[in-house]
Amino acid sequence: MTYTATGSGAFRSKGGSLSEKLGYEFAAIKTETDALRAVDAAGLKIAKGTLAGGLANAFSFAWQNPEASAIVVSRVVIDVTTVGAVAGALLDVGPGATATTHSDTLIDGLDITTAVITADNITNKGSNGLSLCKLDAAGGTTDYITGQILVQAAAALVGKYYIFYTVV
């Protein structure tokens, strides 16, 4: 999920003995595997991807259910790390039939212009947003989650999206 190995130059320049350096790296790996084990035990899966900037009405992302079964999407997190939008730009997120289907039933009208923001469909769902949705199996009628830029351009938008789901 988040562990990144220390580069050889940085590893050499770290203080401490070789044993201490290796101990630190192994502890970081253990923390990561413990977190993955907990997620796996709960059956929760997390998909992530990169937000793309674009003009008004462009799609910032489109994620297709990769599973051979239906899934329940319990949370979508939008993490805007660089604001790059014209005042008034919004983001709608929701389930769709294709990679270019507009939907606002998870997040409706998220303001992506005022600040770096981490938002989700629970706290920041807007007027039409729901706490969860069900997607069809891959290739089904409704098997996408899309994020569409609305009203104004967000050409320099930078960030990630995270989709939390459970196979049904």
Task: Annotate each language-model stretch with its function.
Residues T6-K14, L22-V168:
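Surface-exposed, low-hydrophobicity beta-strand/loop segments enriched in small/polar/acidic residues
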